């Protein structure tokens, strides 16, 4: 599943004439499931790792996980802080379907949004399901 999501992200960026390498990507949701702060075994970590390995600059936003806790598997990510959602990113990747994201208005966002949960109500022009 993570490899498929990465391929959709790659295609979305390619549609803009951009490569993954050097692109700024925002992952929405670090928690394992919606509206909780438990990020153990979250697929978002795998997505972050794969995107970083491809040379992307990756940040995340999660209202329930303001700072990445120390874990054995992802110790190098510990302490990274959640950032605000804004239009400075090349791509937004929704990984966890928090209520905040379902109702967030992405319709005016200039960058593509890849939705792995098929939950965004106010979609941008450049919208991809993964």
What is each PLM-predicted segment?
Residues 1-130:
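Structural/interface elements that position substrates and couple domains in central-metabolism enzymes
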């Amino acid at each position: 599943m993570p490899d498929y999501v990465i391929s959709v992200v790659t295609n979305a960026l390619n549609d803009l004439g951009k490569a993954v390498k050097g692109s700024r990507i925002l992952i929405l949701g670090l928690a394992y499931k919606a509206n909780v702060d438990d990020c153990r075994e979250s697929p978002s970590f795998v997505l972050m790792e794969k995107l970083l390995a491809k040379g992307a600059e990756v940040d995340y936003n999660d209202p329930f996980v303001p700072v990445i806790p120390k874990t054995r598997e992802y110790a190098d990510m510990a302490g990274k802080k959640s950032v605000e959602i804004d239009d400075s990113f090349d791509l937004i990747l929704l990984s966890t379907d928090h209520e905040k994201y379902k109702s967030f208005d992405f319709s005016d966002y200039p960058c593509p949004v890849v939705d792995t949960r098929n939950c965004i109500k106010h979609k941008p022009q450049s919208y991809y399901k993964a």
